[in-house]
Amino acid sequence: MAGSKVKEYKLFLDQHPDVSGIDLLIADLNGVVRGKRVVPSALEKVYKNGVYFTTSLFALDINGDTIEETGLGIVQGDGDSTCVPIPKTLSTTPWHKQTMGQLLLTMVDDNNQPVFANPRHVLNQVIDRFKGLQLTPVIAVELEFYLLDARRDRNKRPQPPISKTTGKRENNTQVYAINDLDDYGDFLSGVSAAAQEQGIPADTAVAENAPGQFEVNLKHEADTLSACDNAILLKRLIKGVAQQHGMKATFMAKPYTDLAEIGRASCRERV
């Protein structure tokens, strides 16, 4: 095991002796974060040998059902592949009541090469093509989301949250409304603080076109893989901080039939 890997997890455990568990995370092709929760002492084994996940993880649709046509499911025995740590992604998760940690993983085959369906591998192939042209893509990801009341309405449909400032259910549709940022200042401050603790370069927060609709932007990065890793982690962070504040967050394109849709996770790029 390389010295830098040993240093990373040992330093983390030394700095957080009260950590009670570590979430081992990997994103599927839909950007859904999946994983396992292990005790802190398991980190040594994870950093040394990796941890097994089923390869069919990359054959799941948005509902979690395996698409057998991918050839990654039962047809090949639904076997496992090794997942190894992505450097510099081991961090705490400050939205949990107890001290918890998380680590982002990537999947490799028996020869320690990326599994063909691994989205990080697909992206890396695109990056290599840019390198062949002596170009460097620089990107920043923008994430739009809705904050929701943790409770559904009487018809079991999602509904906007109640503002802690006004005591009323949100109905504002004013884009760039500073008052909306003030009303949800505690939540947005929690997102900013958690992002800073995790080393995620979150930048600007914007109130969007519908009640409880916001956008958080990441800074530009010349490391495209890192930028996308940070986007995946920011989505988890936003959902966690929302829950911490008694709400839910969704990145669903259109949770309400009569309100503005959410733009897809968009990228600003230059080369």
What is each of the regions a protein language model found here?
Residues 261-271:
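Residue-level detector of conserved catalytic or cofactor/ligand-binding positions
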Residues 3-7, 241, 247-248:
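Catalytic-core signal marking the mid-to-C-terminal active-site face
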Residues 253-258:
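Short, solvent-exposed loop/turn elements at beta->coil junctions and helix N-caps
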Residues 143, 208-216:
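Short, conserved phosphate-binding/catalytic loop or strand-edge motifs used
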Residues 195, 233-246:
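A short, contiguous, amphipathic alpha-helix enriched in charged residues
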Residues 200, 244-251:
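Flexible helix-coil linker/hinge segments at domain or subdomain boundaries
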